[in-house]
């Protein structure tokens, strides 16, 4: 099993979950979430989190238009 790929899948799931929480108006402290990550993983995680936040906001805007 590729542990690196598994770790990225886990980080992606967490980024999506925290972005969903943010979209629901729940407080998310990304600095606390990423505090123990090394720089490479933190950068990747924050980019994925930002991407998911953007996607969820666009989805919400489309839902409000219809």
Curated annotation (Swiss-Prot):
Q: Look up the record and give one Gene Ontology term from the biological process aspect.
A: negative regulation of single-species biofilm formation
- At the top level, the lineage of the source is Bacteria
Alphabetized InterPro entries for the sequence: GlgS, GlgS_sf
Q: Which N-terminal residues, if any, form the signal peptide?
A: none
Which family does the similarity line name? Belongs to the GlgS family.
Q: Could you tell me what this protein does?
A: Major determinant of cell surface composition. Negatively regulates motility, adhesion and synthesis of biofilm exopolysaccharides.
Identify the NCBIfam families for this entry: PRK02922.1
Q: By what name is this protein known?
A: Surface composition regulator
The record lists the organism as Escherichia coli O45:K1 (strain S88 / ExPEC)
